Amino acid sequence: MTVKEIFELRREGRVEEAYNAILPMYRVHHGKYTSRAMFWCAVDMMNLLLGIAVDQSAESLAALDEAEKIYLSLQRLAPKIIDESGSCQQTVINLGEALKSTHIRVKQ
C-alpha cells in the first residue's frame, strides 16, 4: 500500500484501516510523506478512541489507555514534521486538552 492510498482511506473515513496500514510502513521508513501520514492517521485514531472512552467500562478504559499512548507518540513525532503553518503542534495541543477532559470525565 502507498502513502497516497493511506490518505485515501482517511478521506473515506476508514480510520482504523489507514492507521493499521501506516504502522508497518512507518516502522521502516520515516520520510516526509510517511511521517505526515503517520501523524494524521494517529490523530484520527486518537479522536476515534476518545469517542469510545465514555465511561468506566473495560472497553472505554482500554480506549483511553490506547489514546494516551498515541498522544505520547504524537508529541514525539510532531516536532519532526516540517510544518510551517504550525498545524501539527496546534493539533497536539488540542488533543492534549481533549485527552485531559476525557480522562476527567471517564475517571469520575
What positions do the PLM features span?
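Inward-facing hydrophobic residues that define packing positions of alpha-helical scaffold repeats
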Residues: 10, 22, 64-67, 71
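Alpha-helical adaptor scaffolds
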Residues: 11, 26-40
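Alpha-helical segment of the N-proximal tetratricopeptide repeat
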Residues: 1-21
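Amphipathic alpha-helical repeat scaffolds of TPR domains
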Residues: 1-4, 35-54, 86-105
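Alpha-helical junction/boundary sensor with strong preference for TPR arrays
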Residues: 28-30, 49, 56, 71-81
